[in-house]
Amino acid sequence: MTETADAMQPAPNEAREQWTELAEEVRQHQFRYYVRDAPVISDGAFDTLLGQLNALEEQYPDLRTPDSPTQLVGGGFATDFTSVDHLERMLSLDNVFDESELRGWIAKVEQETGPELHYLCEVKIDGVALNLVYENGKLVRAATRGDGRTGELVTLNALTINDIPERLTATDEFPIPTLLEVRGEVFFRLEDFAALNASLVEEGKAPFANPRNSAAGSLRQKNPAVTARRRLGMICHGFGRMEGFEPASQYDAYVALAAWGLPVSTHTSRVVGADAVVEKMKYWGEHRHDVEHEIDGLVVKVDEMSLHRRLGTTSRAPRWAIAYKYPPEEVTTKLLDIRVSVGRTGRVTPFAYMEPVTVAGSTVSLATLHNGSEVKRKGVLIGDTVVLRKAGDVIPEVLGPVADVRDGTEREFVMPTHCPECGTLLAPAKEGDVDVRCPNQQHCPAQLRERVFHVSGRGAFDIEVLGYEAATGLLEAKVIGDEGDLFSLDAEKLIEVPIFRTNAGALSANGKRLLANLDSAKDKPLWRVLVALSIRHVGPTAARALAGEFGSLQRIREASVDELAAVDGVGSTIAAAVVEWFSVDWHQQIVDKWASAGVRMEDERDDSIPRNLEGLSIVVTGSLETYSRDQAKEAILVRGGKAAGSVSKKTAFVVVGEAPGSKHDKAVELGVPVLDEDGFRRLLEDGPDAVAPTDLDVSE
């Protein structure tokens, strides 16, 4: 009785002040995480703060109000998207952080339900929650979690995610329910995240720090086309309101979802008892980087649905599920210095030089800080102890300083005003840019070195022997003045470079290999030439599109901005950069030098391949048996067609393979002809007239 009476005593003023400060701090971090997608502390540090707030409210229950951060899922902050109420609340999950806590939760559950339950063990995806509502099998809305009761409407954006079907597929075993509210996680597959960051770097933009933040930002784009280009994925893992669907277990529900065409995880296991759950927890802790996406824990759920109702929920989380959180992949290290480097397009980038530290299985001593504004935003000083995060193969990121351990010896980083390599005054390329650049593009030693090295890259001429050391050696020995001289190198010139000369004064084996590689590179396809020219924003994807459309460097040079921008996959920014590049005299001199040395400046047309798709826009969706996605696109391009990424009224055909997603439905809606793989093959061989009416599936 005494304990109960004490618990009901009102909180003293000191406790109320502590609660106010702590609640405000938690709200600020929720805002940074859920709204700005830019957290400044680790998940572990946030969990600690929330735990302190929760403990204070446990001690003084009158502090726990409905608007307390402990009672809200995700903070509930307003954004630009239309608000929509969920049919049933989207709850969060309570967390445990070690084996004893996990076993304690299982013991508590089984004390109420009986021993040896079936549990589902699901990898916890580090992504963004999404709520889908299907009525009679059709997706009618998609919304973010928001505060758990109200989210943001993102239906158009969700429809661009290939994993999310616009219509469910009925089966004899699993009829379509009249109403299905299903929850899941939107995420980046690691290879897609790496490709996105590579393209951003190609365009001179700062890469995303981690897949979770970029998934959130990509889903919440005002323009759904941007979301579509980001290649997001989704996995379903929970349910809200359901009508006409009463699964006996969570496992059975997942089987039905998969049958209807909804994405479910292939990493889920059904086990019995605490020992088996702990075994799975340890297994995924050791194999968390073997998964195609980032995971930050293991979700354990009681499998039987009737027990869900029996166990019930708290105000924010179900009692029948728990999240075991793995230790965050963050460490602290000393920031020894911040230095800048000058890239091939003149962009000046500050880098953090740190005491080497092991994180996520690799040793890290260097991390980009992107630009001077980012250094200020993070608030790091030279000499700081900083928090470094690296998950799997993701780019290491300095999250911020540990300010409490500063001793006064730290100093502020000052972005240079002049190029550290050539002394030229730095300036942004255009007003409003956060990046500064060295405008001395032709003669800056750093830019020269980076451009020569870039020529050898796998996306350009792919010359293995021409590494960074070789590029530096060639320039320092003055056997080349710029990248334009590379293909004019011969043995007599190369022997003047120390790294290509033997002790006996002869040309080294690597020197001979370099000459052979340069000679074979002259016959590489046009798109590789375009990439090698270091035109800003032009990476392999845009280069392939331009080469496929125009066929020769001369035609690309003569094209207008509008003509270039009309090419699928190019757009106005890249088009303007191409026109600007060719307007510079010394750029043209590089092209002329390469052409004089025998570098191929146009793609030879294979006369055996008909140009029978000239001007036709064709979309390929789903998996084809005899063509990879790239092979299918290449087959369209060489026949004069355009391999488009989205369906519109201008689309001539949509080619459908396995698991096509919403593009098939869009084609049907617009009346665009749909071809299976056999129809696609006939289209390639004999053109659109050869596609018989029976090949045009517009009925489904």
Swiss-Prot record:
Is the keyword NAD assigned to this protein?
yes
List the EC numbers from the record.
6.5.1.2
Which of UniProt's keywords are assigned here?
DNA damage, DNA repair, DNA replication, Ligase, Magnesium, Manganese, Metal-binding, NAD, Zinc
Q: Which Gene Ontology biological process is one annotated for this entry?
A: DNA repair
So what does this one do? DNA ligase that catalyzes the formation of phosphodiester linkages between 5'-phosphoryl and 3'-hydroxyl groups in double-stranded DNA using NAD as a coenzyme and as the energy source for the reaction. It is essential for DNA replication and repair of damaged DNA.
Q: Which PANTHER family does the record cross-reference, listed alphabetically?
A: CHROMOSOME TRANSMISSION FIDELITY FACTOR 18 (PTHR23389), DNA LIGASE (PTHR23389:SF9)
Identify the residues that bind NAD(+). D43, G44, A45, F46, D47, S92, L93, E122, R145, E185, K301, K325
Residues binding Zn(2+), per UniProt = C419, C422, C438, C444
Q: What class of enzyme is it?
A: ligase
GO molecular function annotations of the record: DNA ligase (NAD+) activity; metal ion binding
InterPro entries xref list: BRCT_dom, BRCT_dom_sf, DisA/LigA_HHH, DNA_ligase, DNA_ligase_AS, DNA_ligase_CS, DNAligase_adenylation, DNAligase_N
The active site lies at K124 (n6-amp-lysine intermediate)
Q: Which family does it belong to?
A: Belongs to the NAD-dependent DNA ligase family. LigA subfamily.
Q: Which residues form the BRCT domain?
A: 608-697
Could you tell me what reaction this enzyme catalyses? NAD(+) + (deoxyribonucleotide)n-3'-hydroxyl + 5'-phospho-(deoxyribonucleotide)m = (deoxyribonucleotide)n+m + AMP + beta-nicotinamide D-nucleotide
What this protein needs as a cofactor is:
Mg(2+); Mn(2+)
Which protein is depicted?
Answer: DNA ligase
Q: Could you name the Gene Ontology cellular component terms for this entry?
A: cytosol
Q: Which Pfam families match?
A: BRCT (PF00533), DNA_ligase_aden (PF01653), DNA_ligase_OB (PF03120), DNA_ligase_ZBD (PF03119), HHH_2 (PF12826)
Q: Which SMART domains match?
A: BRCT, LIGANc
Phylogenetic lineage? Bacteria, Bacillati, Actinomycetota, Actinomycetes, Mycobacteriales
Species assigned in the record: Rhodococcus erythropolis (strain PR4 / NBRC 100887)
